[in-house]
Amino acid sequence: MNFFTMCVFGAAIGMAIGTLGTAIGQGMAVKSAVEGVARNPGAASKIMTTMMIGLAMIESLAIYALVVCLIILFANPYKDIALKMVETVAK
């Protein structure tokens, strides 16, 4: 495997792990909010507002994972070093 193939696999695995954690967290948050509304329907607006803020914070982790994976794919700081190594090996 060359450097760029490893970058693609690394970005894919990183995104999978990052979204898996956020998906589990969001599922647990929604489950708890639905249980809270079922127990106290009068507090539904407060519960939903708090849940939406919490979901936005949880989703930010997935966005950070996406940004890191995009940096790995398109703005990799080690790309030039890898290309120089390939050139020296090819000579």
From Swiss-Prot:
Gene Ontology cellular-component terms listed: plasma membrane; proton-transporting ATP synthase complex; proton-transporting two-sector ATPase complex, proton-transporting domain
Domain of life from the UniProt record: Bacteria
Gene3D superfamilies to which the protein is assigned, alphabetical: lithium bound rotor ring of v- atpase (1.20.120.610)
Molecular function (Gene Ontology), one example: lipid binding
Protein location: Cell inner membrane
TM region(s), chain numbering: 4-24, 53-73
Keyword entries, A-Z: ATP synthesis, Cell inner membrane, Cell membrane, CF(0), Hydrogen ion transport, Ion transport, Lipid-binding, Membrane, Transmembrane, Transmembrane helix, Transport
Subunit-structure text: F-type ATPases have 2 components, F(1) - the catalytic core - and F(0) - the membrane proton channel. F(1) has five subunits: alpha(3), beta(3), gamma(1), delta(1), epsilon(1). F(0) has three main subunits: a(1), b(2) and c(10-14). The alpha and beta chains form an alternating ring which encloses part of the gamma chain. F(1) is attached to F(0) by a central stalk formed by the gamma and epsilon chains, while a peripheral stalk is formed by the delta and b chains.
Task of the protein: F(1)F(0) ATP synthase produces ATP from ADP in the presence of a proton or sodium gradient. F-type ATPases consist of two structural domains, F(1) containing the extramembraneous catalytic core and F(0) containing the membrane proton channel, linked together by a central stalk and a peripheral stalk. During catalysis, ATP synthesis in the catalytic domain of F(1) is coupled via a rotary mechanism of the central stalk subunits to proton translocation. Key component of the F(0) channel; it plays a direct role in translocation across the membrane. A homomeric c-ring of between 10-14 subunits forms the central stalk rotor element with the F(1) delta and epsilon subunits.
Name the record gives this protein: ATP synthase subunit c 1
Organism of derivation: Pelobacter propionicus (strain DSM 2379 / NBRC 103807 / OttBd1)
